[in-house]
């Protein structure tokens, strides 16, 4: 009890303790005078007002008492104790610390200075009364987080003369700094600079920075060229792309040799590169986004200058761009000159040469130029980026044609060949009736290339559309034009053989004829089909042949000329025959036009028959001839296509897409639907529907709605129902239902039998419709029966594909709907409906179906029964969906409620007074004499109610009780208080005056502070526990002094991992060796700094770091349980409870990292290890890609990680720390299903799946509970703004069991209470031992579980409030709680870390001596085998540490020995002495 201390320390020598100290210190104060005035308070403030050794304060106060009696002017001039001389810089530092305690866990981030001692400014609370510790009950006693006026100045009430001097000096100093700072290229200061300053900055940047850059680069820096790109860059400049002609894609990710085959690492291509060369090593997962520390200072100016200049120069054309534009313009000018010559030659010649040219985009990475497909009508794929002219040759395909190309190009340029070509082309032109038609020549601007003959190129095969060609006169209005130019064939014609001449000339004649109704429109295509050959496009650019070569005699060309002349007569005969055939087809076209008009009158539905008459076929809407008239296209019902019997297209495979028929080499030939108008249903359509065009439009719409799955084609081909004789008998019956009007694969496969069947003729139109309907029903029933029997085997073997096929076969359900109702009820989907036509038919009173009422009733009953079942299934599914939605809402609401409850608990107004708040309040009163005087006088007046200027014992008793309550002290013993009262009462008549009370009040506060709220002068930072040593020399010999290598555990591109044994403490550990030569651009220190700072039970610990010239050695804890991936690969199925435990630990570690703004960026099962085989404690490793994301921005652009686990926003290179949540969701999916949710064979395929696909959540309902599924959906949310943080997810109802009340074992409470009784230096040593504690047993696992449960906000550290709640529920007194909290918080940071918590809770009594040896070696910095005072000062990196505390520690160590007296000075401690002392304290 404090009063007992006062009683024992009080000495009755006619003067009180307080006044006695005044006399003793008066002489000391006179000697120092101004020196103490200037320096004492400054020294105290530089220690953040934490030095509570009150000797200096007492001296200052005593001086104040002595000088108080002097005149006022003397006091004001010479002695100023109002603390106005406190350094302004310290004031700013204190103000910066305001509210730091309330949000200490959020503010203390990675990289902060841990030397800063936590302090509390009491004036942050405007309601706090500095003058009293014993406020009235009506006063609000605020807690540490109730600060409202951080701007309030502590010393604003006092004189400011010396403060003004400091302010003026600081202003002068700041002006000088700002003057130089202004001309530094600082983006933050640039916002405050005026225009004049900006011009100066720009001048300095343009001169100094460029010179520095030139020196660094060893080049002359060019003006207006602020950014230099290397040849390896993706783009050469801002406007023109540099294509990769070798590879189609660039490899943006590297495969690590250490990782699984499916792990790919993706790095940002646009990250800034270092200025030095890199080794071409691959395989590691590091992503370097900054320059090395060695080059950072040198490159800073250059990088800033470039960054400043890029924006200003974006609109300027750089020299390399000018050269590129000039080369383009030169090519354009040359092409323009050639085309001008062509125009001149066109005027001189009356003959026409039909040369085709193609304008085509250059795709460098596709090397299939020689097999292209082109279309005369499709203009959607034109692109004017590259206007190179190419010549098309139509030739019979031969494999050896490419070998003779170069030689042939030389031979065809001869004059004699040209004259011959001119002759026969002139003769051909004379035969044409439409020779007067001149096609348009397109000329573009002078800066662009001239478009000669534009034929759009699609794919590998040549394709000419016969159905969408328009009139030649209208072709000049389209983009794709086939213009025939008159020009010199000696320069541009490259015809090789007789067959090529025939093909080319015949096609040219057809084009010149311009008759779009002729039958042989695609003459070349048919010629190709007959010869089983293909057309070929040669994309060789036009070569300018040297004119001197034309004059040289060439024997070969002469022989070719004779050969051509011999064949000329046969050629002319063929041309004449074709011309006669054209005239005949013109007559047929006129007849076609007449019957096409008749067709639209809707009066001749019975005109068509099954004969082979060509006129009848030409009138059929499904005829394979073209029926276009003046650009009015006829809809092709058989859009699926059918193989032409004379083509090699029969082996073509149709892909699973409704539009794949458009990608074939030719348009699919139209099926001859001879039964189109012969059935009753068709006639009914013509009679009752409005017109044919509307019906066709409806057919198109229904076709697109059906979205047929074309995989059914292969299934039906497998069945091959055409060979079924019984089926052919039914096919002979001409009746068809309405769905037959649609082209489907089922009918297409039977078309051959339909064509060969002579019995398919027009039926008598007078037959009753109900007979047709009965026959149709029998036919469909039988077909369906046979069909279902034959596909049963396929259904068994490929059920999933068949299910998808049936779901999409709308045309199938329409055609055989009635029969399907009877045979197979389970394959229906929601799209099955009773046909509208059949409903209307039943509703008609005069329907002939009245004759067959029995059949109708049975069918209708079946329909109602199936409809009812479908309705019930739909209702059940709707209920399940509604239940899922309600559960999701309920779970989300519950998670939000849990988080709100957590926030309310943190911000409630209960009076939970933390020890730091009380300590800071006591420190403020004891450090400032004037504040103490005010506090003592206010307390005295508060209890002197009658203003009698003295206090009775009863009043003193009430005062002490109130003081103990506010400062959370034990209750007062009345007997001891009466003794103390008598000792301090100088009047001896039960009347204590103010002077006596002031002395007692001073002594009482000092004793309270010493026992209950002591100051910790010996503090250790975490980076002091992890030692970093530099090894001497280039060899590895020195590392063997510390570690013994046992075996290699793994190796990668940048280093190796070994199992080692510590030579000193004999503990097994793991060392990661990183070779510096292979890691020039990867900062090893980033990973080391992150691991040093992070302290969590689920994150790997590091012990030591050794650095040599060649390598860096990182010593980490050993995890013997192996990777999580190894357990996933095993066939064992995990229970949901097991997965929940794993996910809880992962999310706890993620929440801790995110609270410190650290993103791991490479979470995957390979980077999650089990500590031991017997326990499921996890450790997250490999922080090589970890990044500290700025809290203000919250966005990173350094994309890195393993592709299979990367979040969608990482691919966009704009992501937050929530990318780790996505990776955890993928791991959770992996644990439940043993498969990844997003896979692919290539990087691009995986990327597209991540962006576009969703996991099969319906399948997951069978494998996990609904809360688990809801949590998984939240984690795999593609929009990261809607993806919750890890701390929020940990309050999800799935983790409800982890929120149960925490019961702390009595043994653990005893360990904590014993821990609080020892000195701070001893507890620091125990913390070092706790860090070296790398074993996992039941006791350690229990402590880990308690730590995670106490951490209610899941930020990885325990606040004083969280500890207070748990210990108070355990029955610990609040004054003991304050002492426990202060003992656990070794560094006074305001929160308790994992290592500090385990140091106080662990049972150290039976600890192995190896951990004591490890702690001893950490303290023994000079490695001489002894702990000296200098070693302790070096350990805390503070040479000014209080020597008194260290001396007390040395005395305590040697006091356990009987032979050593306390008076003997001891300067060293051996390991044996250290061991005996530590074991005695446990």
UniProtKB/Swiss-Prot annotation:
Which keywords appear in this protein's UniProt record, sorted alphabetically? ATP-binding, Calcium, Kinase, Magnesium, Metal-binding, Nucleotide-binding, Repeat, Serine/threonine-protein kinase, Transferase
Q: Where is the composition biased (Basic and acidic residues)?
A: 749-760
Q: Which GO terms describe its molecular function?
A: ATP binding; calcium ion binding; protein serine/threonine kinase activity
Cofactor(s) the protein needs? Mg(2+)
Stretches assigned to the Protein kinase domain: 1043-1295
Where ATP is bound, by residue?
A: 1049-1057, 1072
Q: Which SMART domains match?
A: EFh, S_TKc
Q: Where is this region: Disordered?
A: 250-320, 739-760
Which EC number(s) does UniProt give?
Answer: 2.7.11.1
Instruction: Provide the binding site for Ca(2+) 3.
Output: 1420, 1422, 1424, 1426, 1431
| Top enzyme category | transferase
Q: What is known of its domains?
A: The EF-hand domains 1, 4 and 6 appear to lack a functional calcium binding site.
Q: What does this protein do?
A: Calcium-dependent protein kinase which acts as a sensor and effector of intracellular Ca(2+) levels. In sporozoites, probably involved in the secretion of the cysteine protease that cleaves circumsporozoite protein CSP, thereby exposing CSP TSR domain, which binds with high affinity to highly sulfated heparan sulfate proteoglycans (HSPGs), resulting in productive invasion of the host hepatocytes.
Question: What name appears for this protein in its UniProt entry?
Answer: Calcium-dependent protein kinase 6
What gene makes this protein? CDPK6
